[in-house]
Amino acid sequence: MPHYQNVPFEVPSSWVWCKLEDYVKSVTDGDHQAPPKSDIGIPFLVISDVAKGKLNFLNTRFVPQEYYEKISFDRKPEKGDLLFTVTGSYGIVVPVNIDCKFCFQRHIGLIKTLNTSEYLLHLLKSSYIKGQCDEFATGTAQKTVGLETLRSFLLPIPPFAEQQRIVIEIEKWFSLIELIEGGKDDLQTTIKQAKSKILDLAIHGKLVPQDPNDEPAIELLKRINPDFTPCDNGHYTQLLNGWTVAPMQVL
């Protein structure tokens, strides 16, 4: 851990600490001037279009092609880059996983990566980075993580081969967690069905063993209501011995 005296925590000896800006091509944000609007052209994303951690082009506005062409290269997202929201709902990381031209507002940062970005993606989503955002965000109405702050974030970087192993392990466990999460609805349905089945068995006299020594239910009804007259059970041929049918008001 060469030139950083005060690092946030210990890492293996083969790892290194570095600033984000030392690990990527560039860290920029969107145009600070309001872009011109257009009915057609290049999609222009705002924070609400990336708020769920994915690119969403369903309700995007557009800017003219000419405007997009004037944007500098380091502000044009490419497949493999990462978006990082810096204002308001800061700290949302969005992988650029499509080969499509688009641009974005100044409340979103663009991290142009040097190599595969999977490890960096997971690192930027970590509570460690969220803590740095919370610590250094400024402003009152809308907190902002400034670009210089973002560029200066200290990152724990493992050897590349270990990065790949870490990513595989993370994604394995995340898949399991998502499977459990996805099964919640199925589990709730199963629970409801089980409860319904238990009640169904109960009211059909199939939940507990029948004891021939039990007093018939008709005797219970007679004690509750001496004037009770048993129903004609012709439609209830499946009633068990000792059971009876009675109107609700006599219970």
Question: In which residue ranges do the predicted regions lie?
Answer:
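Short amphipathic coiled-coil heptad-repeat segments
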Residues: 1, 8, 173-221
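Non-catalytic DNA-recognition/assembly elements of restriction-modification systems
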Residues: 2-29, 152, 156, 164, ...
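A short beta-sheet element
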Residues: 46-47, 65-125, 146
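Low-complexity, Lys/Gly-biased intrinsically disordered segments
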Residues: 16-53, 70-72, 90, 244-251
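Short, basic/aromatic beta-hairpin or loop at an interaction surface
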Residues: 49-63, 97-98
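Specificity-determining recognition surfaces
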Residues: 34, 126-155
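Short, solvent-exposed loop/turn positions at domain surfaces
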Residues: 9, 31-32, 70-71, 139, ...
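Glutamine-centric residue-chemistry signal
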Residues: 105, 142, 163-164
